Amino acid sequence: MNKGIVDQLTRLSIRLEELDKLLSNEKITADLDNYRKLSRERSEIEPVTRFYHTYQQVEQDLATAMEMSVDPQFRDFAEAEIDADKQKLADIETEILKQLLPRDPNDERNIFLEIRAGTGGDESALFAGDLFRMYSRYAEREGWQVEIVSQNPSEVGGYKEIIARIIGHGAYSRLKFESGAHRVQRVPATETQGRVHTSTCTVAVLPEADEISGVTLNPADLRIDTFRASGAGGQHINKTDSAVRITHLPTGIVAECQEGRSQHKNKAQAMSVLISRILDKQVRAQQAEQAAARKSLVGSGERSERIRTYNFPQGRITDHRINLTLYKIEQIMDGELDELCSTLAAEHQAAQLAAMIER
């Protein structure tokens, strides 16, 4: 195992012993906030230290087996034990590295899902509607809740743009690799010659910012406009200026919400979207710097980056970042995204592991 990783594991083992002593101290247990903080730290490092202790025990077993192998009487038994112990060490090392990987602090958050029609005119808007249905069906399968924040329907169906909030444990961890350009190849219903048309939509997945996100907005930097909602909602919505648009003047970032009947609720939702977009911009700037040194296997997540092609005549979906092709387009468009999401997450983790080993 890499010496740097061994040193890190040794430090964690020492820290675990320190935490056990602290948590048994009455003065510590009397301070509930500090007790919770230390308990949380212990729960985070205990699994990897347990794996490390097992690794050390197997190392000792391997050393014993190698000593036994020089004795002709025990050679066959010892060699079998050596092979088994080496495999155990490799398996445990993989688990240790996974435990040491930096965790995305946003993984458990809700998300804002933004889908926008791109090139392809009406067909692009229709595909935006198909993508929204796909993600909505996936959310339904996961037991998540979907709330439409704003929508701009197309005259022919689908959406020029739709923004939704998806509420559910781990929503960001499952869908964060969906950001990018999605290309569709199919024969439009209006096509009389049977020609395949190509259209695109862009998808953005933003983790919802929480109240302690660290973003403080100066009211002087905000322009808040109210207007009459143009979407669904009935006569009441169209008679009142319930829709809200907030512009962050320093960055030019805009967020709006018009789905609720209450201007107050729409303003709160628009503010949440705005803060999430500002945070997303900051994170992307950091990721761009990191990507300059090492390009991630699953891509940068840039909105303009083509990540996936949906070819309906061939019944296939190809994710270009990991060269994965699945011939199950109907199931995927109906929200069966587990195989795609899991494979992307696994490839991302493999890239992280490779980078850790190289260091």
Swiss-Prot record:
PROSITE patterns, per database record: RF_PROK_I (PS00745)
Top-level taxonomic group? Bacteria
HAMAP family given in the database record: Rel_fac_1
The entry's function note states: Peptide chain release factor 1 directs the termination of translation in response to the peptide chain termination codons UAG and UAA.
PTMs per UniProt = Methylated by PrmC. Methylation increases the termination efficiency of RF1.
Keywords (alphabetical) are: Cytoplasm, Methylation, Protein biosynthesis
Which Pfam family, giving just one, matches this sequence? RF-1
Which family is this protein grouped under? Answer: Belongs to the prokaryotic/mitochondrial release factor family.
Report the locations given in the UniProt record: Cytoplasm
Can you name a GO cellular component term?
cytoplasm
Q: What is this protein called?
A: Peptide chain release factor 1
Q: Supply the SUPFAM superfamilies for this chain.
A: Release factor
Protein biosynthesis is among the record's keywords: yes
Question: Which parts of the sequence carry N5-methylglutamine?
Answer: 235
Q: Which GO terms describe its molecular function?
A: translation release factor activity, codon specific
Q: Does the keyword Aminoacyl-tRNA synthetase apply?
A: no
